[in-house]
UniProtKB/Swiss-Prot annotation:
Residues bearing carbohydrate: N122, N235, N304
Domain of life of the organism encoding this protein: Eukaryota
InterPro entries, per database record: CLIP (IPR022700), CLIP_sf (IPR038565), Peptidase_S1_PA (IPR009003), Peptidase_S1_PA_chymotrypsin (IPR043504), Peptidase_S1A (IPR001314), Trypsin_dom (IPR001254), TRYPSIN_HIS (IPR018114), TRYPSIN_SER (IPR033116)
Pfam families in the record: Trypsin
Native source species: Tachypleus tridentatus (Japanese horseshoe crab)
Segment forming the signal sequence: 1-21
EC code(s) of this entry: 3.4.21.86
This protein's name: Proclotting enzyme
Keyword Protease set for record: yes
UniProt xrefs under CDD domains: Tryp_SPc
Expression (tissue specificity): Expressed in hemocytes (at protein level).
GO BP terms in the entry: hemolymph coagulation; protein processing
Binding site for Ca(2+): E194, N196, S199, D202
Length: 375
């Protein structure tokens, strides 16, 4: 009887719109961990899991058609999946606040040297299960940042190519150990198009560039990683190829969006465990972004998590950016497929420590600074 009621409420009235709903579902669920919970939220549910409607008794017991219909987050065949609340608290459709639309606000300032084409990646993969080796050439803006110390040149951080002359990385990657001064530009170099740091026969054909200018945020604080962003200017113009091209900056898209619960990608050559060995090959992982308040509470004994920070990771740990991933990109695709740089790997408690997400510099909070300094 329950099954029949559910189908009469949801499935049959929606058959005429199943194509539209399925398309929206794919857009929402395109980049997910199939082995992890599919997190979701809507105006009825602050935090939920996208699951088969028959498995969500909390919503079924409400006997509210509009609530069920507007909670749809996907389909299993023709059976709807709904955003099922993690707690028993869920408001009815008559109590829910009205849906709002946001008018796109014009950006205050846009760098004149942004590329016309950006964010085009080279993989058909739409999901990552845990951390894994990235396909060769999948992330063509990924940058290895080298530092020469004591005559030895080694990868210390990651970065993201954003124009044909500029790489964005973390401020803590470019300052001295005291965090007081920027290291000279000639100790830095970058490598584009790399896959395996220690192999020359992996078909990646990387290219090295010297760095002529290093600009870090003038109000960077090493103790709290506040304003953890820097721009490297390369000595020559980068010729874009299928394996080397820039990621988009969120000037016209994502700038004012609430990114909580979204699942961006992070890439790097960092260690796969705290104090463990570095990875020779580029690795990728996909992590959910935390609600700001949850992140603030997680770190409230350590520092004040303001709006310039963004947190991502699983509450039970297990997957995270790690040592050596610093400065690397947090990347989110838009509906048209282009990837945007929304975060910079900054810091965390060890690596994937339960209860403590990784912390990232929120790029949308620094777009005016980038426009001013990326010349």
């Amino acid at each position: 009887m329950l099954v029949n009621n559910v189908f009469s409420l949801l499935c049959f009235p929606l058959l005429m719109s199943v194509v539209r709903c399925s398309t929206l579902s794919r857009q929402r669920r395109q980049f997910v961990f199939p082995d992890e919970e599919e997190l979701c939220s809507n105006r009825f549910t602050e935090e939920g899991t996208c699951k088969n409607v028959l498995d969500c008794r909390i919503l079924l017991q409400k006997n509210d058609y509009n609530l069920l219909k507007e909670s749809i987050c996907g389909f299993e065949g023709i059976t709807p999946k709904v955003c099922c609340p993690k707690s028993s608290h869920v408001i009815s459709s008559t109590q829910a606040p009205p849906e709002t639309t946001t008018t796109e606000r014009p950006p205050k300032q846009i760098p004149p040297n942004l590329p016309e084409v950006c964010g085009i990646h080279n993989t058909t993969t739409t999901r990552i299960i845990g951390g894994r080796e990235a396909p060769i050439g999948a992330w063509p803006w990924m940058t290895a940042v080298y530092i020469k110390q004591g005559g030895i040149r080694s990868v210390q951080c990651g970065g993201a190519l954003v124009t044909n002359r500029h790489v964005i990385t973390a401020s803590h990657c470019v300052v001295n150990s005291a965090g007081t001064d920027v290291m000279p530009a000639d100790v830095f170099s970058v490598r584009l198009g790399e896959h395996n740091l220690y192999s020359t026969d992996d078909d990646s054909n990387p290219i090295d560039f010297a760095v002529t200018s290093v600009k870090h945020h003038e109000h960077f604080v090493l103790a709290t990683y506040l304003n953890d962003i820097a721009i490297l200017t390369l000595n020559d113009t980068v010729t874009f190829t299928d394996r080397i091209r820039p990621i988009c900056l969120p000037y016209r898209k994502l700038r004012y969006d609430d990114l909580a619960m979204r699942k961006p990608f992070i890439t790097g050559w960092g260690t796969t465990a705290f104090n463990g060995p570095s990875s020779a090959v580029l690795r990728e992982v996909q992590l959910p972004i935390w609600e700001h308040e949850a992140c603030r509470q997680a770190y409230e004994k350590d520092l004040n998590i303001t709006n310039v920070y963004m947190c991502a990771g699983f509450a039970d740990g297990g997957k995270d950016a790690c040592q050596g991933d610093s400065g690397g990109p947090m990347m989110l695709p838009v509906k048209t497929g282009e990837f945007y740089l929304i975060g910079i790997v900054s810091f965390g408690k060890k690596c994937a420590l339960p209860g403590f997400p990784g912390v990232y510099t929120k790029v949308t909070e620094f777009l005016d600074w980038i426009a001013e300094h990326m010349v």
